[in-house]
């Protein structure tokens, strides 16, 4: 397989430090049978990347893959990365992150500390090495400006694991102050293992209206991520 060039360009005039990038990449028919055969390179240096098969050719080879990774760019910088097929891929290499599950929480270890997800709750806590934990949550207010309560259906579910990130999802419903259901929600946390960055995506669904999706990225040292009013 020929190298596939991925060109990244910073156009907003701001330096980017370890920002998440996700994109789909098409592959030629019959060239790649499994994702472990692929590597993402920055010159001669490999980049930690999490690859997920999206589609296959009729012969079973990969047709599309989704790549997730972190990248740093200076203001106005253009950077070319290359997706290559490894000559000697190692199918047995393990990239399983350290995850500890207890009755009251799920803890994901990162290179900078840990992220603890509270069971049956839309709360999590980020702890960095030699620093106290930072509690985080998502809040919602109703049309009167009153805070709603997040009632989870069950505990957080780990949906993706790999060398780049761990993803966890929590589903439930928002309740008004009188316990009347307001809307459904689904929250996904994408925890990047190299930096402790957490990417938050929240979808709310009011059966009487359309779905609404919001997302933000927070560092381990930043304040909790909060979303605005439901109208």
Kindly give the residue locations of the regions a language model identified.
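Acidic, contiguous internal or C-terminal segments within carbohydrate-active enzymes
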Residues: 158-230
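Short alpha-helical segments and helix-capping/turn motifs at coil-helix boundaries
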Residues: 93-95, 101-103, 152-154, 184-188, ...
């Amino acid at each position: 397989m020929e190298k596939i060039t991925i060109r990244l360009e910073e156009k907003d005039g701001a330096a980017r430090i370890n920002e998440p990038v996700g994109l789909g990449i098409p592959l030629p028919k019959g060239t790649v049978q499994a994702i472990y055969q692929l590597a993402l390179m920055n010159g001669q240096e490999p980049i930690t990347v999490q690859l997920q098969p999206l589609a296959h050719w009729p012969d079973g080879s990969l047709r599309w893959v989704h790549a997730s990774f972190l990248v740093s760019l200076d203001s106005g910088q253009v950077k070319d990365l290359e997706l290559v097929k490894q000559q000697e891929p190692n199918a047995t290499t393990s990239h399983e992150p350290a995850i500890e599950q207890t009755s009251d929480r799920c803890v994901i270890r990162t290179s900078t500390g840990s992220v603890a997800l509270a069971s049956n709750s839309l709360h999590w806590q980020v702890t960095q090495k030699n620093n106290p934990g930072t509690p985080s949550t998502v809040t919602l207010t109703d049309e009167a400006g009153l805070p709603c309560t997040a009632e989870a259906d069950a505990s957080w579910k780990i949906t993706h694991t790999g060398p780049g990130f761990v993803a966890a999802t929590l589903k439930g419903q928002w309740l008004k102050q009188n316990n009347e259901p307001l809307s459904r929600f689904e929250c996904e946390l994408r925890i990047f293992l190299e930096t402790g960055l957490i990417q938050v995506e929240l979808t709310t669904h009011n059966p009487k209206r359309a779905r609404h999706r919001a997302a933000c990225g927070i560092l381990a040292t930043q304040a909790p991520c909060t979303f605005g009013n439901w109208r």
